[in-house]
From Swiss-Prot:
Signal peptide region: 1-25
Gene Ontology cellular-component terms listed: anchoring junction; apical part of cell; apical plasma membrane; cytosol; endoplasmic reticulum; NADPH oxidase complex; plasma membrane
Region called Interaction with TXNDC11, residue ranges: 960-1242
Gene3D superfamilies per record: EF-hand, Haem peroxidase domain superfamily, animal type, Nucleotide-binding domain of ferredoxin-NADP reductase (FNR) module, Translation factors
Keywords for this protein: Calcium, Cell junction, Cell membrane, Disulfide bond, FAD, Flavoprotein, Glycoprotein, Hydrogen peroxide, Membrane, Metal-binding, NADP, Oxidoreductase, Peroxidase, Repeat, Signal, Thyroid hormones biosynthesis, Transmembrane, Transmembrane helix
UniProt-recorded name of the protein: Dual oxidase 2
PANTHER family: DUAL OXIDASE 2, NADPH OXIDASE
Pathway per the UniProt entry: Hormone biosynthesis; thyroid hormone biosynthesis
Length: 1545
């Protein structure tokens, strides 16, 4: 073991204590002694830490804790502290000290205690021994509520103690345990430096040199509020070496005394030694002041206090432990409390006792103690002379009697803790004793070898028997329970009792003899014997005389004792009656006044998403307006041209409907046309010669309204901008009527009456509904009650309308066709027998009867008559050609004249009429001989026709077209639509491979029907179980990954929550805000993990690479974007919970006292006694975590709202820009946690690895996407589709179905948009088909509409990033795959189909044996470019791998006469050219929406050996949801398993 000689330790102590920056050589030579440290270290060379600041108290008697370790004793074993104080220590003031001890001696004792010990600092984590106030307490519970609790926080303890009964808790002494002037100079070098002026060796003074400067940071003086006035802050408090040196003016006066004495000594030394520098002067003055302080305390004050002379000093005893004991603290402090008077006199040197001013109550003979605690800028002590008068007054005033009574100024009006302005000093002292684990009174006597009383009667006979009896009753007559504090006071009378005297004397002797720096120790080199004798002869009177400049005769020789011959006797012993009343208790409500602001702040934070939504709405509005401007740009010239011949106005459609702009055109053929703002014809009104035009004008409200009455139709109501515009139109109309020989009647009425008189379209619609209801009631023999009764109304306009004749437009609308269609014109002309341009009820009924009840011959004759345009009884080839052309109009198709001629010739040739130029009705009916059943079921489908009209149409098995029609039963059935026979035949057995023109060798099988009949019906629970099993099977990889990720997040949450709830380092935060800290810290860990690893879901290059590895069998990399959204939403929920947790925290922290917050946040708060916590807005807006948290909520609100699907569809650029806020998000997240308010930063633990991977992935993309790529070809296709063909970069490898991100240099280099490649991997160039649906794609179409140069320079270049993978790449992993594309969502399948056929032509081995491609489009012309690709696939598909079904949804979904004829023509066209009349393809063409459930059901029967079928859909959300729902429905059955992948556009 290494041994160190004492001399070496002395040298080490000298090196550590002597300043290293002397002013000069003379200075260095002048400090010939070892300078004493400020923190108490090395005062004892054997035990360096003895007496050091922060060292524990050392017990004289073993601890007395309830558990033997740290838990304090309390009720019911010991009495209530307040009850004990009120019962035992209560008594009248004004009892004079028996020994004539002065008040100066009492407060000098308090000053000595502040130099020796300080345990007022609360411990951490906060522990409370609250004092419960008995109900009805006159001071603290005058209203008898019974729920008043005075908070008492336990003191700071040594963390190395309190572990076991052999090592019980010991409190920590915050100051040095030596009598070394720490109350004057501070207990640390830094504290002393703050007190010094560093000039002339003096302590720093304020504007008045007699006063030190005021307390300020970083000098943490104790600054509680004034309990009398509530004044707060350091203003008016002085900087002393003792933290609580400003507690009372009396203690403050003693601090000022020693401050001035030090500066006096420094000034004297400076005069004597002019060459000394500041450090020498300061250290010499400090040395002399400390020695004088030690001498006065030990040899003048202590004997007067104990009435005992301490033993003579012999030598320094290094083996003696001088540490302060808790018993000494209790004995001395509590004995002083009995001597404190209710007031303190002030006098001058001539013995004149001053009247003191009380701002509230006037003048009084003395300062009231209870109203002087922590007083700021006392008007009675605003000068050095006033302080001198207070010191002289204390020297002349005799203290209270040394007994058990404590004045009410301490007992009831001591400065209170927390939100209480007052507390009970005695009760708090009792609790402090229990906190320190003080022994009982009898245990202390026994331990110190003193006589122990046997019973209660053995106490001091001077004790009031009633007090003794009451005390015994509180302790249940058990003397062994009597506490040290109570017993010590009860045994004292006039002088401290044996116990207190023994404890105090022992402590001071140990302090003296164990201190190496004691002034009488001649071996330390501090003083010579002459100097020691001089110091011993210096008394406090000498100090007072030197400082106050009063005559020595104005003070008695011993200022701690007043004798009869002493000068300036006090006027009288002060009582409470002579003084102002104590300011009563007040309770501070920390949150008072903060409620509205706190609520508004929370509401504002909750409204952040709404504010973001409002901003997004404004952005979407402007983007929509911009898009409309782009769309209108091409129509402006047309509109201007139309405005030349038309009149602009607003049409009023009816009440509670918005008016809309229209343009009125008057045509020479007596027609009035109403056009919308897109110049589309809304309505055509035919004005007949024998009709008079009725015009009604408004004569009020601006005279700008006009009503045009139209017989047998709804009226036209126009609103003009002004009367002049209306007048111009009326003149124009008058001229038009005159030129067309039309009569015009003009009338005027009020505008409101005009509106009531008008027959609106809505009213006309109700009349037509009744018209059709009764029409079908007569045709189909429906009961009148079922048809509905005609409404009876006396209104003239309704009676006129009930004559009800249909116009050509209404007739066309009822058939779902256009008025200008040839079919409409032919049918209308045929039915309009009287030729008046309208169909009456009877005329329509005659035609309807033929369709509803007529034979096939009647129907064909009707068709023949309709198209016999010249009425000669023959149908020429030209008329037949016209008929076919009218059929084609239904699909908006435009076949060439040659194609139509070929169709007509083929039909004539098929019927054997190739040599005829005209057909009779018999010939025409013969041509339809194969379609007798179709004609039999043909009806005229009318809107509003009621039930029973539509009948399923079942064409021949070799048909390439089908109609999807719903019967009423099907409309109400859950399965929706039946499978047409064309589909059943297409999917059935060997017929599946038949081409048109070839006859089937077997009858068409009814696979779909038979399969339904054979299916086993399961119960509801069984179906749900099967559906669940299929869901798990489909998404097992997704479920496992989500479960693992969720488990990690949950684990992080639980770990942090458990840590802070139970095993965190003792800071007290869990006890302060248990729910808030668990919620906030648990969610913080999970959110940190989520926001870190969400970056991996956006590492597109890494995902594309990994999906080609074996990991793709376990991780669904194609669901990265969905997983990204899921993480984002989960993180959002947890972020909200995190915010809620912090809202709880902020509220709790805003109502928690500063002492508690200083424990929870030691790096932020310092407990200076000011009590008040920070307001809520400080936490929100003035801290780094709070401010960054609010900013994070703002960023999240913007990012999430702008990332919503709704907004992305309206402004992709807004989404693109706001999503780049993620950089700001991560910066704020890092800053948010870096403040380490509760824990050390942990975000980097989660963030570092994903961030590095993400940055690497972005660098890979950056290296690619900054290469300019030339566009080879640009085509503008119908339906707003732009086809771009561009160079394929070198080394660019991709797979069919993948997508890329492009930026157009002409539109900005930073805005990238994702599009699916429509080129195949084997092609030399890349191609995209981009539909103009937003501003960016619309501008892209504009840019590429006009070439700018020659060659590759003709078009703006592109930046390319990708390729990236999607789930559609897995089509080849299934034996049977179904591809469903809707709208622009067909783009991935264009690449897949081309790739499939290419691989098939090369004879590549593929698992996939059959692909069904379902294309859903409004019209076959919508995406003609895809038709070309399908045509190419059909030409190269020699192995019949692909079966294409095209669903045209815009066709009339009615089985009427014209669609029947259309089907017949389609069939003949297929026979001739083996391709569709509409698309030119061999694909199956359907009119209607795809019936997914029957289609998938039939696939199970067609491919019974296949157990798993892949379904890949891409398109609008509605379509993909239907596919997903169908797959889930079929997966309930224990048959083929349908695995669905989808992507929404």
């Amino acid at each position: 073991m290494l041994c160190i000689r004492p001399e070496a330790l002395v040298l080490l102590g000298a090196l550590l204590t002597v300043p290293l920056d002397p002013v000069g050589g003379q200075d260095a030579l002048s400090l010939t002694w070892e300078v004493q440290r400020y923190d108490g270290w090395f005062n004892n060379l054997r035990q360096h830490e003895h007496g050091a600041a922060g060292s524990p108290l050392r017990r004289l008697v073993p601890a007395n804790y309830a558990d033997g370790v740290y838990q304090a004793l309390g009720e019911p074993l010991l009495p209530n502290p307040r009850q004990l104080s009120h019962t035992t220590m209560r008594g009248p003031a004004g009892l004079r000290s028996i020994r004539n001890r002065t008040v100066l001696g009492v407060f000098f004792g308090y000053h000595v205690l502040s130099d020796l010990v300080s345990i007022e600092k609360p411990g951490c984590p906060a522990e409370f021994l609250n004092i419960h106030i008995p109900p009805g307490d006159p001071v603290f519970d005058p209203h008898k509520s019974g729920d008043v609790v005075l908070p008492f926080q336990r003191s700071r303890w040594d963390p190395n103690t309190g572990q076991s009964p052999s090592n019980p808790r010991d409190l920590t002494n915050e100051v040095t345990g030596w009598l070394d002037g720490s109350a004057i100079y501070g207990s640390s070098h830094s504290w002393s430096d703050e007190l010094r002026s560093f000039s002339g060796g003096q302590l720093a003074s304020g504007p008045d040199p007699a006063f030190p400067r005021q307390a300020q940071d970083p000098l943490f003086m104790w600054t509680p509020p004034d309990p009398a006035t509530g004044q707060r802050g350091p203003q008016g408090l002085y900087a002393f070496g003792a933290e609580q040196g400003n507690r009372e003016p009396f203690l403050q006066a003693l601090g000022l005394l020693w401050f001035r004495y030090h500066n006096l000594c420094a000034q004297k030394l400076a005069r004597e030694h002019p060459l000394w520098g500041d450090e020498e002067l300061f250290q010499h003055a400090r040395k002399r002041v400390i020695a004088t302080y030690q001498s006065i305390t030990m040899y003048e004050w202590l004997p007067s206090f104990l009435q005992q002379t301490p033993p003579n000093y012999t030598e320094y005893r290094p083996f003696l432990d001088p540490s302060i004991s808790p018993e000494f603290l209790a004995a001395s402090e509590q004995f002083f409390s009995t001597m404190v008077p209710p007031g303190v006199y002030m006098r001058n040197a001539s013995c004149h006792f001053q009247m003191v001013l009380n701002e509230s109550y006037g003048s009084f003979p003395a300062l009231r103690v209870c109203n002087s605690y922590w007083i700021r800028e006392n008007p009675n002590l605003n000068s050095a002379e006033a302080v001198n008068q207070l010191l002289l007054g204390m020297a002349s005033q005799i203290s209270e009697l040394e007994d058990w009574i404590v004045v009410e100024d301490l007992r009831d009006y001591w400065p209170g803790p927390g939100k209480f302005s007052r507390t009970d000093y005695v009760a708090s002292s009792i609790q402090r004793g229990r906190d320190m684990g003080l022994p009982s009174y009898t245990q202390a006597l026994q331990a110190l070898g003193l006589n122990t009383p046997k019973n209660w009667s053995d106490f001091n006979p001077n004790v009031d028997p009633q007090v003794l009896e009451a005390t015994a009753a509180l302790y249940n007559q058990d003397l062994s329970r009597l506490e040290l504090f109570s017993g010590g006071l009860l045994e004292s009378y006039g002088d401290p009792g044996p116990l207190f005297s023994t404890i105090v004397l022992d402590q001071f002797v140990r302090l003296r003899d164990g201190d190496r720096y004691w002034f009488e120790n001649t071996k330390n080199g501090l003083f010579s014997k002459e100097e020691i004798a001089e110091i011993r002869s210096t008394t406090l009177r000498d100090v007072l005389v030197a400082v106050t400049n009063v005559s020595s005769s104005a003070l008695q020789p011993n200022v701690f004792i007043w004798n009869e011959d002493s000068p300036c006797p006090q006027p009288q012993q002060l009582t409470t009656e002579d003084l102002p009343h104590c300011v009563p208790l007040t309770v501070i409500q920390y949150f008072e006044g903060s409620g509205p602001g706190f609520g508004i702040t929370i509401v504002a934070l909750c409204c952040l998403p709404l504010m973001s939504l409002l901003i997004s709405g404004v952005v979407a509005y402007f983007r929509s307006r911009e898009r409309k401007k782009l769309q209108k740009r091409g129509k402006e010239s047309v509109k201007k041209e139309a405005d030349k011949d038309g009149v602009s106005a607003m049409e009023w459609p009816g009440p509670k409907e918005r008016s809309y702009p229209v343009s009125i055109q008057l045509l020479p053929d007596r027609h009035l046309q109403v056009l919308d703002r897109h110049l589309s014809v809304l309505r055509t009104i035919q004005l007949r010669p024998r009709h008079r035009v009725n015009l009604i004008l408004s004569n009020n409200l601006g005279r700008r309204t006009l009503l045009l009455k139209i017989p047998k139709e709804y009226d036209l109501v126009l609103l003009f901008n002004s009367e002049d515009e209306r007048g111009a139109f009326v003149q124009h109309l008058q001229g038009f009527c005159a030129s067309c020989a039309l009569g015009l009647d003009i009338d005027e009425m009020g505008e409101s009456e005009l509106f009531r008189k008008a027959v609106t379209k809505q009213q006309r619609g109700r009349i037509l509904e009744i018209f059709f209801r009764h029409l079908f009631a007569q045709v189909l023999d429906i009961d009148q009650a079922d048809a509905g009764a005609l409404p009876l109304d006396s209104s003239q306009k309704v009676r006129e309308a009930l004559t009800c004749e249909l116009s050509r437009a209404e007739f066309a609308e009822s058939l779902g066709l256009k008025p200008q269609d040839m079919f409409v014109e032919s049918m209308f002309s045929l039915a309009d027998k009287d030729g008046n341009g309208y169909l009456s009820f009877r005329e329509f009924l005659d035609v309807l009867v033929v369709f509803m009840k007529g034979s096939p011959e009647d129907k064909s004759r009707l068709m023949f008559t309709m198209y016999d345009l010249d009425g000669n009884g023959f149908l020429s080839k030209d008329e037949f050609f016209t008929m076919i052309r009218s059929f084609i109009e239904i699909s908006n198709n435009c076949l060439s004249k040659a194609q139509l001629t070929e169709v007509v010739e083929s039909m004539f040739r098929e019927a054997g009429f190739q040599d005829k130029q005209e057909l009779t009705w018999e010939d025409f009916h013969f041509m339809l001989r194969d379609h007798d059943s179709e004609l039999r079921h043909t009806q005229l489908c009318v809107k509003g026709g009621g039930g029973g009209v539509g009948v399923i149409f079942k064409p021949d098995i070799s048909s390439r077209v089908s109609f999807i029609i719903r019967t009423p039963e099907e409309r109400s059935s859950p399965q929706g639509v039946r499978l047409p026979a064309s589909e059943a035949s297409e999917l059935g057995g060997p017929v599946l491979k038949k081409r048109f023109g070839k006859k089937a060798v077997v009858p068409p099988p009814r696979l779909y029907t038979e399969a339904l009949q054979e299916k086993k019906q399961r119960g509801f629970l069984a179906q749900k179980l099967q559906q669940y099993k299929r869901f798990v099977e489909n998404y097992r990889r997704h479920i496992v990954c989500v479960a693992i990720f969720s488990a990690i997040c949950a684990g992080l949450f639980v770990e942090r929550a458990y840590y802070y709830a139970f095993v965190s380092p003792p800071s007290g935060i869990a006890e302060t805000t248990f729910v808030g800290i668990i919620l906030s810290r648990g969610t913080a860990a999970s959110v940190s993990f989520m926001f870190s690893y969400i970056l991996l879901t956006m590492c597109r290059n890494l995902i594309t690479f990994l999906r080609e590895t074996f990991l793709n069998h376990y991780v669904p990399f194609d669901a990265a974007v969905d997983f990204h959204r899921w993480i984002a939403m989960a993180a959002l929920v947890l972020a909200i919970l995190h915010s809620v947790g912090h809202v709880v925290n902020v509220y709790i922290f805003s109502v928690s006292p500063l002492s508690l917050l200083a424990c929870v946040f030691p790096s932020v708060f310092v407990n200076d006694g000011s009590k008040l916590p920070q307001k809520f807005y400080w936490w929100f807006f003035q801290t780094i975590p709070g401010m960054t948290g609010v900013l994070l909520l703002v960023v999240l609100a913007i990012m999430y709202v702008f990332a919503s699907p709704y907004f992305r569809r309206r402004s992709f650029r807004g989404f693109w820009l706001t999503h780049h806020f993620y950089i700001l998000l991560y910066v704020l997240l890092i800053i948010h946690g870096s403040f380490a308010l509760i824990q050390l930063p942990r975000f980097h633990i989660f963030f570092l690895v994903p961030a590095l991977i993400y940055v690497g992935d972005k660098l890979v993309s950056l290296s690619r996407k900054k290469v300019e790529i030339s566009v080879v070809k640009a085509e503008l296709l119908p339906s707003g589709v732009t086809h771009l063909q561009f160079q394929r970069p070198q080394g660019f490898e991709y797979k069919s179905g993948q997508w890329v991100r492009i930026a157009c240099l002409g539109l900005g280099t930073n805005e990238y948009h994702p599009f699916t490649l429509t080129s195949a991997p084997h092609e030399d160039t890349l191609s995209l088909h981009i539909r103009a649906v937003g501003p960016w794609t619309t501008r892209l179409r504009e840019i590429y509409s006009h070439p700018m140069g020659d060659g590759y320079a003709r078009y703006p270049k592109l930046y390319l990033d990708g390729p990236f993978g999607e789930g559609h790449q897995e089509w080849h992993k299934f034996e049977v795959s179904v591809l469903v594309g809707g709208g622009i969502g067909v783009t991935p399948f264009a690449s897949i189909l081309k790739d499939l056929v290419f691989k098939s032509s090369l004879g590549s081995q593929m698992l996939c044996k059959k692909i069904y491609f379902i294309w859903v489009t409004r019209t076959q012309r919508q995406f003609e470019w895809l038709a070309d690709i399908i045509r190419e696939v059909e030409e190269n598909d020699h192995r019949d791998l692909v079966s294409v079904h095209i669903y045209i949804t815009q066709l009339a979904e009615k089985f009427d006469l014209r669609t029947t004829m259309l089907y017949i023509c389609e069939r003949h066209f297929q026979k001739v050219l083996n391709r569709s009349l509409f698309t030119g393809l061999r694909s199956i063409t359907h009119f209607g929406r795809p019936p997914f459930e029957p289609f998938f059901n039939s696939l199970q029967e067609v491919h019974p050996q296949v157990r798993k079928i892949g379904v890949f859909s891409c398109g609008p959300p509605g379509m993909t949801k239907n596919v997903e729902k169908t797959c889930q429905l079929i997966n309930r059955q224990d048959q083929t398993h349908f695995v669905h992948h989808y992507e929404n556009f």
